[in-house]
Curated annotation (Swiss-Prot):
Belongs to the methyltransferase superfamily. RNA methyltransferase RsmG family. It comes from Acidiphilium cryptum (strain JF-5). S-adenosyl-L-methionine binds at residues 85, 90, 135-136, 149. This is Ribosomal RNA small subunit methyltransferase G. Its EC number is 2.1.1.170. It is an enzyme of class 2 (transferase).
Length: 217
């Protein structure tokens, strides 16, 4: 990583730096730096991230690394994926930068955030499109991969994801400390295979890999 201020990631901890460099190439890192700079510039106007997370080091650790840690769980190959409630492009645009062969559809109903996403896609020349509608209004071909971060409780999230998920596909959801309780609640209405992977950025959080998702009989 380059040094210096701004959004270059020069202020992150050594541990965060090493984790990011282990996941992406130097070229990808350069594009992530450009993306982080866009987040900083736009956050002053439309609150893409909370104010306490608006410092460069926090953007890299709490948002970019948080999204990048999903990479080892992303299926291989070229396909289209759906990112639900994309907000500031986390994780959708981060994954689009790291896996350019995957075409991401970013579903975001907030017009200002959708405008940010469209700007980032154009400036960074990403393989992604923005669908500025509510998730339940989205009309897409089912995808092998559906992603989301800090969007809704799992019983609701499964309702959003199921119509957009292709047979044999997987969901990757970044969840906070209530993930286990949410899985228990979701099991009342859904059948699934759920795998839990510990977060690298929050000791109590997790990445959930959901497959074989269907409504309970």
């Amino acid at each position: 990583m380059s040094g210096g201020g701004g959004a270059s990631a020069g202020d992150v901890s050594r541990e965060t730096r090493e984790r990011i460099e282990a996941l992406v190439s130097r070229e990808t890192l350069s594009r992530l730096e450009a993306f982080a700079a866009l987040i900083l510039r736009w956050t002053a106007r439309i609150n893409l991230v909370s104010r306490k997370d608006a410092a460069p080091a926090e953007i890299w650790n709490r948002h970019i690394l948080d999204s990048l840690q999903m990479l080892p769980l992303v299926p291989q190959g070229a396909f289209r994926a759906a990112d639900l409630g994309s907000g500031g492009g986390l994780p959708g645009l981060v994954l689009a930068i790291a896996r350019p062969e995957i075409g991401f559809t970013l579903i975001e109903s907030d017009r200002r955030k959708a405008a940010f996403l469209q700007t980032a896609i154009a400036e960074l020349k990403l393989n992604a499109t923005v669908l500025p509608v509510r998730i339940e209004q989205a009309r897409l071909e089912p995808s092998p991969l559906v992603t989301a971060r800090a969007l809704a409780a799992l019983p609701v999230l499964f309702g959003y994801a199921a119509p957009l998920l292709a047979p044999g596909g997987v969901c990757l959801f970044l969840k906070g400390r209530g993930a286990d309780a949410e899985l228990t609640a979701a099991a009342e209405g859904w059948q699934m295979r759920a795998e839990r992977f510990p977060s690298q950025t929050d000791a109590g959080a997790a990445i959930l890999r959901i497959s074989e998702l269907r409504r309970a009989a």
